[in-house]
């Protein structure tokens, strides 16, 4: 796959950045609709986004570099080069959510009211963003047979044929899962007014899909012999179940 979308003068604009930008833009459009459902301020949401998005990019890069520091030890300037990938979504989520929490606390706004609205947009951005991995020929799984890959569209087959070998299109598996979760979260946002349910459902469902898909990947970040993404996913599932249970229990009490 050609990772370059187009050139502006001598500057090569990569598909990776273009696709992330498209995901962010469509996420904002979806948030406009979801703010109306929850009667939340879209202006406040935009302010929140302007803080969360750059924080998430920084967090995603920092998280990746921490676990892959040996690749940057001899050339530290490359830490700042994100154009070819090297963003870990878990780091982005952690830093983005933390930045939003601090901002909304300062603004004296309800944290869960806005992250509930944001959850479908976040997972939509993730679903679209995975296609950036496709154009970078990264985040794929282990080798597969030609017979297996032949079940996929021709352009997927070509993109997953890397250096003479076909690979699992794990980016596609996760993209499809994330789109399904997005649709469910929009539905849930309409059906429940309990603050925190939608956001914690996002954490749990994304983590569930990521846990299984991560097991197929060949480029996982490791902590010893443990895949970091699977460890974080297990914690996310437990956290989600715990919070949703307590939110429902608290509502029943009153």
Swiss-Prot record:
EC number: 2.5.1.145
Family in the record: Belongs to the Lgt family.
Cellular component, GO annotation: plasma membrane
Residues reported to bind a 1,2-diacyl-sn-glycero-3-phospho-(1'-sn-glycerol): 130
Domain of life where this protein originates: Bacteria
EC class of the enzyme, as a word: transferase
Pathway involvement of the protein, from the record: Protein modification; lipoprotein biosynthesis (diacylglyceryl transfer)
Membrane topology label: Multi-pass membrane protein
HAMAP family: Lgt (MF_01147)
GO MF entry, a single one: phosphatidylglycerol-prolipoprotein diacylglyceryl transferase activity
Protein name, as recorded: Phosphatidylglycerol--prolipoprotein diacylglyceryl transferase
Keyword Signal annotated: no
Membrane-spanning parts: 11-31, 49-69, 84-104, 169-189, 196-216, 228-248
Pfam families membership: LGT
Keywords: Cell membrane, Membrane, Transferase, Transmembrane, Transmembrane helix
Gene Ontology annotations of biological process type: lipoprotein biosynthetic process
Subcellular location: Cell membrane
